Design a protein with these regions (language model features):
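Hydrophobic core register within WD40 beta-propeller blades
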Residues: 75, 121, 169, 232-235, ...
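Structural WD40 beta-propeller signal
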Residues: 78, 124, 172-174, 238, ...
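Generic structural signal for coil-to-beta-strand starts
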Residues: 82, 127-128, 135, 176-178, ...
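Residue position within the beta-strands of beta-propeller blades
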Residues: 84-86, 130, 178-180, 245-247, ...
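Acidic, glycine-anchored loop motifs typical of Ca2+
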Residues: 101-107, 142-147
Length: 423
């Protein structure tokens, strides 16, 4: 009898692991990859990235893919286990399979073309949802030939790609589709309420009835979930269900203002400061926002009405993609962390260059940010800004794969890197 119970327990454990693995790979809200029973691919021999880039002690970095035909931006792993990446400027999606499991992509396969500035990607129910400059589409392989030729429009209720043209999407834990759209300007009062905002749709592109402005007289306002977010290139949900977004602040106030807002606790129906206000201070912050004096506040509106950030970085750091470290190959001490890809500065003075890097933001026991430290550095040429031609690379996105390794896209060096822990 006891042998029968052992068999039942083993089967149940195996079923649980397989079930969690499939859920992680198929997409959804915030994807948290749980530990797998399969062995991770081996670490390839040291290459240019391994020799040039500095990674935190106990980790190694290698090139996963290089010589991409255009600038790689945001990434997502598909239900097939392969990495997909948007090539924004060429209007393409590339697939990077590692069929021989050696830790490097075997080839670069263009699986979709003729898209309009594709950026954010997320898989759901066998479809790849793509955030384009002025629309959301979903793609799949309808005939089994490996290309994503079947295409459906979800919504074109997205502002035109003027100014900040990247669009990012994620499905939330509520099953709704969230889309970030940046501003059309450095600082201004936007005519279109969908700009400098996070929008919220049903999966079919319709407006949820519980959106804060679902019945507004201006139909453009109906998809708005939160606003005052000048350029939130990425966002995610914490295990506790809180929505966090990053935010690229305005230029023109010197090297030190305004700080980049890295962790903004986004609240539905709320204003988050831009263009009138910003969160002061660097690091952990707790005070109200302060005014950008270049633009007058509307009558009756004050900066203490804005939702402030909880954690900031030096001005002009340019935070782009971000991800949480739970359920990865990383040692336990590195899992309770937020990882952020910084594009780095292009317009600061020589003594105040902001580095292009991947940074680790440490979270406390209740999941709140408390400190930051470099995780991957060495992309920038000494003394040169990240926008300089001598720059080796500029991180754009950071995600974890189904085997628990970290992947970093580099839209300057046209590479994807893979980071794993080492003994």
């Amino acid at each position: 009898m006891w042998r029968w119970w052992i068999i039942v327990i083993i089967v149940c454990i195996g079923w649980t692991i397989v079930g969690h693995t499939a859920a992680a790979q198929s997409g959804g809200g915030m994807t948290l990859y749980l530990p797998l029973v399969s062995k991770a691919p081996p670490l390839p021999p040291a290459d240019e990235a391994g020799r040039r880039l500095q990674v935190a002690p106990g980790f190694a970095i290698r090139i996963f893919a290089e010589n991409l035909p255009q600038r790689p931006r945001f990434m997502a792993f598909g239900p097939d286990g392969w990495l997909y990446v948007s090539l924004m400027n060429s209007g393409q999606i590339a697939r990077l399979p590692d069929r021989n499991s050696d830790g490097r992509a075997d080839t670069i396969e263009i699986v979709a073309s003729d898209l309009n500035l594709p950026h954010g990607l997320e898989w759901r129910d066998g479809w790849l949802y793509v955030a384009e400059g002025d629309r959301i589409e979903r793609l799949r392989d309808g005939d089994g030939n490996g290309s994503l030729e079947t295409r459906e429009l979800i919504t074109d209720n997205i502002p035109a790609p003027v100014g900040h043209s990247s669009r990012t999407l994620h499905f939330g834990p509520d099953g709704k589709l969230y889309v970030s759209a940046g501003s059309s300007c450095n600082y201004c009062v936007e005519d279109d309420p969908r700009r400098a905002a996070i929008l919220r749709f049903n999966p079919d592109g319709s407006i949820p009835g519980d959106n804060p402005f679902a019945t507004d007289l201006d139909p453009r306002r109906r998809p708005v979930w939160a606003w005052g977010l000048r350029n939130s290139v990425d966002f995610l949900w914490t295990p506790g269900g809180e929505l966090w977004a990053d935010h690229n602040g305005s230029d023109g106030l010197g090297d030190d203002l305004p700080p980049e807002e890295i962790v903004i606790p986004v609240q539905g129906g709320a204003w988050h400061g831009w263009p009138y206000c910003y969160t002061p201070g660097v690091g952990v912050v707790s005070g109200p926002e302060v005014q950008d004096t270049r633009i007058a506040l509307p009558a009756g509106q004050t900066c203490d009405q804005a939702v402030p950030a909880r954690f900031t970085a030096p001005a002009h750091s340019a935070p782009l993609g971000m991800t949480l470290g739970e359920g990865t190959l990383f040692p336990p001490a590195y899992r309770q962390s937020l990882y952020v890809a910084y594009h780095g500065s292009w317009n600061t003075t020589a003594g105040n260059i902001r580095d292009c890097k991947v940074e680790r933001i440490l979270l406390n026991e209740v999941g709140q940010p408390i400190a930051a430290e470099p995780f991957v550095t060495g992309f920038r040429a000494p003394g040169k800004p990240c926008g300089d031609a001598a720059t080796y690379g500029r991180p754009a996105d950071v995600i974890f794969g189904p085997e628990g390794a970290m992947y970093i896209s580099d839209d300057k060096g046209l590479r994807i890197y893979r980071v794993v822990p080492v003994p």
